[in-house]
Swiss-Prot record:
This is Gamma-aminobutyraldehyde dehydrogenase. Its EC number is 1.2.1.19, 1.2.1.-. It catalyses: 4-aminobutanal + NAD(+) + H2O = 4-aminobutanoate + NADH + 2 H(+); 5-aminopentanal + NAD(+) + H2O = 5-aminopentanoate + NADH + 2 H(+). GO terms for molecular function: aminobutyraldehyde dehydrogenase (NAD+) activity; NAD binding. Keywords: NAD, Oxidoreductase. NAD(+) binds at residues 146-148, 172-175, 209, 225-228, 280. Pathway: Amine and polyamine degradation; putrescine degradation; 4-aminobutanoate from 4-aminobutanal: step 1/1; Amino-acid degradation. Homotetramer.
Amino acid sequence: MQHKLLINGELVSGEGEKQPVYNPATGEVLLEIAEASAEQVDAAVRAADAAFAEWGQTTPKARAECLLKLADVIEENGQVFAELESRNCGKPLHSAFNDEIPAIVDVFRFFAGAARCLNGLAAGEYLEGHTSMIRRDPLGVVASIAPWNYPLMMAAWKLAPALAAGNCVVLKPSEITPLTALKLAELAKDIFPAGVINVLFGRGKTVGDPLTGHPKVRMVSLTGSIATGEHIISHTAPSIKLTHMELGGKAPVIVFDDADIEAVVEGVRTFGYYNAGQDCTAACRIYAQKGIYDTLVEKLGAAVATLKSGAPDDESTELGPLSSLAHLDRVSKAVEEAKATGHIKVITGGEKRKGNGYYYAPTLLAGALQDDAIVQKEVFGPVVSVTLFDNEEQVVNWANDSQYGLASSVWTKDVGRAHRVSARLQYGCTWVNTHFMLVSEMPHGGQKLSGYGKDMSLYGLEDYTVVRHVMVKH
C-alpha cells in the first residue's frame, strides 16, 4: 500500500511519529505510517506557494486537461481505489466501486469543464476616461482537510474546485482513513506540475495545526466536526485566512399524512443507513405526522431489521462497520442515553454487534421528543429517531430548532405544501419526496453551525477565487 507523502512532486516518507491505520471490519492494524514533520509541512506549503506563480497563470484549458487526466486514471484504477477504501473504511466493496468511484470521477470532470466557464463580469466606463473590469482570480495556497467518512470523495470535492480555479493545494486526509488520498497522490504527481498538489499524513495537532496556521496558506477548507471547525477558525483568526467550512448535520425528514409511506420507508432504509449512517446528510431525524406515525414506525422498523451487516467484501452486505473503536463507543453511548429517557422505544437494533470489528446494529428509535439529545445532536451512525408532530407550523418550527443547517427533506403529495415548507426550512438543501441525492452541478453546503461555503457546482468554484477590480485609465 502506498504510504508516502507527496511534497513538491516527490513521494517521501514521513519524518514524524508513526501512527497505526486500522481495518475497522476486523480491528486489525493494516500498517503504520509516519506523520509529516513540522519541516515537511513547511516544505509542502512553500512548494505550493512556489508552484502557484506559474500554475495560477495557466489557462483554464490547461488546468482542465490535467483534471481530465486525473479523472481518467482514477477511473482506470477504480477497483484499486475501491478496495483501499473498503479495507480502510469498512465500506461494502460494491458500494465503494459502484456508487462512489463514478461520482468521484464525475466531480473532476465537472470541474474540468467549469474551469473553462469561470469569468468575471464584463464591465464598462463608470468614471470618464477609465474602463473597469472584474476578475475572479485564484487565491494561492489552499490547505484542505478531508474527513474519514468519505476519504476519496471529499479529497475530490476539495481538490477539484481549488485546482480548477488555479490554486495550489496541500491536502491532509484524516489520519484514520488516509490510504486512498495517498494513492491519489501517487497518480497525481505524474499529471500536475511539482508543488501544485501536496498530500500530507498526520494528526490535527501535529500536522493540521502547523498547516492551517502557516503564513503562506491563504485559505483553509474543512469538512469535519463542529469542534474541529471552531478550532480551525480560532487557530487561523490571527492571520485572517479565508475559511470554507462543512461541519456536519442532523437532517430533518418531514413526513406528512399524505406522503407515500412505501417510498418513505424505502428512502429512509437507504438514505438513513448508507455508509453505516456516517454521513452528514443522513436521513436520521424523522418527524411523522400523527395520522401516519404508527404505520410508519411499524413498516420502517420491519424494513430496517432486514438491513444486512457483514464483511465489506460480501456482495450481500449493506452496512459495514463504523470507522473506529472510539466512534463505535460514541454511537453506543448516544443510544444508551436515549434508552435511559424511558419514553424512547427501541424498535430494532440498539446494540453493538458481537464479534470482531466496529459494528453497530442498524437502529430505529420511536417516541423521541424535540428536546431529546438523540433529536438535537448528531450521532453519525446507523441510528434514526422518529418524532410525532401535529401540524405544519409545529414541524417547521421543530425542524428549524437545531444548531445544524445542512440538509432536509419533505415528503408529501401536496405540491403547494412542498413549496411552502421548503421555502421556510433553514437548510442548505431541501429534497422533496427523496433524500440524499447529489449531483456535481448543484451546490452542497450548510447554514448555522453546519458551516458556510459551497462544495460542487459553479458556486463551489467561485468560493476558491477572489473578486478583483481592475481599472484602466485611457
